[in-house]
């Protein structure tokens, strides 16, 4: 089933809109693209993973930040962090975006980066307690298959990967639960990535470009989180 996602994109003229539409023309699953030049926003309807749309826009030298997905109260997000001592400088290693497309079906867009090459196994946990994660996250609420991390990030020797997973569940049953990403399908290892699922904005619920709390633009805030490891995932 289709859903709509809005993205903030720096647009200078109608030619920029045309370039973005052309870049997205070959992304599988896109049904329509609407470009709002004055608002510096594009909205994309279809079944494509938001992370794939961001990647396609970045491939033409522009940038894109997800501003909303799905209908009100139908979207959630989970930032996945490493608590390993060696990752203290850049703890953020992944992001999961969740959008409900029906009362019983949600799509989960999982992106991982800055990791050793290999297969990783994400799962939703019964608890959202990360005080002693991953042990405090409890047992498996829902396994989410696997993510192949095999795309070279940079000269760092680390890799990234992405998966788009269907989940027969409701967003309301996921809010507040934890997520874990482990290198084992059966055991959540001590240095697994962890995070807590929280509600996120639906389409057009967050079209502002300046944060009222910090006074920073969305692009300045993006740089802040990228310095902590969240590369190309917002």
From Swiss-Prot:
Which Pfam family is one of those matched by this entry?
HMA
For Cu cation 2, which residues are the binding ones? 211, 213
Keywords noted in UniProt? Chaperone, Copper, Cytoplasm, Disulfide bond, Metal-binding
Which parts form a coiled-coil structure per UniProt?
A: none
Q: Where does Cu cation 1 bind?
A: 13, 16
Q: Name one GO molecular function term.
A: superoxide dismutase copper chaperone activity
In which family does this protein belong, per the annotation?
Belongs to the CCS1 family.
Mind telling me what this protein is named? Superoxide dismutase 1 copper chaperone
Which species is the source of this protein?
A: Yarrowia lipolytica (strain CLIB 122 / E 150) (Yeast)
